[in-house]
From Swiss-Prot:
Gene3D superfamilies noted in UniProt: ACT-like. Chain A, domain 2, Met repressor-like
GO terms for biological process, alphabetical: response to nickel cation
Database matches in CDD domains: RHH_NikR_HicB-like (cd22231)
Official protein name in the record: Putative nickel-responsive regulator
Protein species of origin: Methanopyrus kandleri (strain AV19 / DSM 6324 / JCM 9639 / NBRC 100938)
UniProt keyword annotation of Transmembrane present: no
Lineage: Archaea, Methanobacteriati, Methanobacteriota, Methanomada group, Methanopyri
Listed InterPro entries: Acetolactate_synth/TF_NikR_C, ACT-like_dom_sf, Arc_rbn_hlx_hlx, CopG, CopG/NikR_regulator, Ni_resp_reg_NikR, Ribbon_hlx_hlx, TF_NikR_Ni-bd_C
Length: 141
């Protein structure tokens, strides 16, 4: 158990049935001990990524922001956001996943704070279902 987790609190969440089925399959395969453990680990990882966006400064980073979205619902707002961040977006790739969904990958270079703000804005667009930011320092650290 991690430090600070000795006072666990019970809560409940609502997830799509297919997602819960995948969680149960991972547990049955031995990847995780329980549903609680998989959700705790996923939350820790997600919160660490979000916390980076809150503390990063103006150091230069390279990165990729990959996201899946509902085409008709999100695309107009996504285009607007992308136009506000042309200073850090160096390339965009767009793939049609299905008639309703698309995947985009933005290749990024620039101040970490600006990249973090872009990721925050993309995640906040209604219709974005998943978004993952991966960054590396230009210093190689």
């Amino acid at each position: 158990m991690n430090k600070g987790e000795d006072n666990l609190v019970r809560t409940s969440i609502t997830v799509p049935e297919q997602l819960l089925q995948k969680v149960n399959e991972l547990i049955a395969s031995g990847y995780f001990a329980s549903r609680s453990e998989i959700f705790r680990q996923a939350l820790r990882e997600y919160l660490q990524r979000i916390e980076w966006t809150e503390r990063v400064g103006d150091e230069e980073y390279f990165g990729a922001l990959t996201y899946v979205f509902q085409h008709e619902r999100a695309e107009p707002e996504l285009v607007k956001v992308q136009h506000e961040f042309t200073d850090v977006i160096i390339s965009t790739t767009h793939i049609h996943v299905s008639p309703e969904k698309c995947l985009e990958v933005l290749l990024l270079q620039g101040p970490g704070k600006r990249i973090a703000e872009l990721a925050k804005r993309i995640r906040g667009v209604r219709g974005v279902e998943q978004a993952k930011l991966t960054v590396v320092s230009s210093e190689g650290e």
